[in-house]
Amino acid sequence: MIQVEHKWIKEIPVLHIFDETRASEQLPTVFFYHGFQSQKELYLSYGYLLAQRGMRVILPDAAMHGERHGAESDTEQAIYFWDTVRGNIDELPQLVEALNEEGLVDMSRLAVGGFSMGAITSYGMLAQYEWLKVGVCLAGSSYYEHFARALADGVAKQGMEFPYDVDERINELAPYDLSAQPTKLKNRPLMIWHGKEDDVVPFAYSEKLYEALVEEDMSDNVAFMVDEKAKHKITIEGMLAAVGFLEEKL
């Protein structure tokens, strides 16, 4: 039977999903991240399907989201979007360490994945942590600087003011920007899924990254899936492909 356990790890609320018959085993583990203005519970389908296939799954809530959502307005969530992404990236080692101390994870078989903001998060994690084995990025962008400037322009056009220096904040994203250093992927398995009609995170970002990886001779382990009609919403086919990719590569 698949178990869903709500717990707090290092003050981070997560859903922990696993097969109860293997509850105490060191299992391959997937950290899967939700999208902007969403929450961990909406991604339980991924956790269930992956746990059926023998993986341990951790669904965290990002800062300002889910159980970590305080009095922040929609505007504040938008203004601090990249702080939320960086928070996810910086918190990952804490989650891994805590689970390893409990003897629950196979440290040689760790993966990250996510949709939209979760995919953006996952790209940054792959740029930061060589110990991650697999990544699944659904409707995201690895082009941190370019996308950050586009988002900032959109926020400014709505009359919102930033309580910080935008250029300085964007410059701070450089270490997480996989597009600027694609060789950091180091031929690790990566699945990229994107809908061509995406009106939130442009499809061009995924296409451009794949082309860059091809140019660097690093596309052998990359699965690039394109949905010709999808907007900013993962399809059933995309979800099942992501689960199958993680099962195969992890």
Give, region by region, the residue ranges found by the protein language model.
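Short beta-strand element of the alpha/beta-hydrolase
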Residues: 25-35
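Conserved alpha/beta-hydrolase
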Residues: 49-73
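C-terminal catalytic histidine-bearing segment of alpha/beta-hydrolase fold enzymes
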Residues: 207-250
